[in-house]
């Protein structure tokens, strides 16, 4: 309250919880600024690796181990393709973020990886991609699928009987990278439900009612 007028304003104390949409705004902004400082003057690409529905129950039960495996395999797959790319033949850098839920809060693990179209080759030379095409999404999906299944078997996991032969990996050009970083920063440090989506809360029933927007599903692989 102001001592010189009747104006009053409520300021909530910071709880510091990672699910709090207000507390994590500052952390998201800091992360974005750190990533912005690392941006190179080259074209960037956003590669999304999606785990099929048949493996989601297994992944949910063993999330720590399998999430780590997904990060490792996704990055290794991109580096393999980078070394074989005729224009690059280079080790690619990457920034990877795991998303675990849809807007409906359904468990839907997928990795977003931001990749610069440039790298250092085996002779320590800087190589830059020409154009807006990096990798074929279907080719990435085939290699990613084979490596994930092999990795799960090597780790001793029992796979479901029906595992789809076609997985989805999308690879799209995102300009100089900043739009993709801004997109990821909105989800990286915040909870899965934004404050503006909450409609009602019943403390007795311990239920929360919230709004969500249906996302557009894509059945193909970009590239």
Task: Name each model feature, range by range.
Residues 1-223:
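Beta->alpha loop/short-helix hinge microenvironment recognizer with preference
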């Amino acid at each position: 309250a102001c001592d010189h007028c009747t104006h009053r304003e409520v300021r909530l104390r910071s709880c510091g919880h990672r699910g709090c949409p207000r507390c994590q705004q500052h952390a998201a902004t800091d992360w974005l600024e750190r990533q912005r400082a690392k941006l190179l003057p080259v074209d960037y690409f956003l590669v999304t690796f999606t785990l099929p529905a048949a493996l989601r129950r297994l992944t949910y039960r063993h999330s720590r181990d399998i999430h780590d495996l997904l990060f490792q395999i996704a990055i290794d797959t991109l580096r393999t393709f980078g070394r074989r790319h005729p224009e690059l033949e280079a080790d690619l850098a990457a920034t990877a973020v795991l998303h675990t839920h849809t807007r409906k809060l359904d468990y839907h693990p997928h990795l977003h990886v931001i990749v610069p179209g440039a790298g250092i080759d085996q002779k320590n030379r800087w190589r830059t991609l020409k154009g807006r095409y990096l990798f074929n999404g279907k080719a990435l999906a085939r290699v990613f699928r084979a490596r994930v299944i092999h990795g799960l078997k090597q780790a001793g996991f029992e796979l479901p009987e029906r595992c789809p032969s076609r997985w989805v990996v999308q690879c799209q050009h995102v300009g100089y990278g900043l739009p993709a970083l801004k997109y990821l920063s909105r989800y990286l440090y915040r909870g899965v439900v934004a404050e503006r989506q909450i409609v009602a809360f019943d403390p007795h029933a311990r239920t929360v009612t919230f709004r969500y927007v249906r996302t557009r599903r894509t059945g193909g692989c970009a590239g």
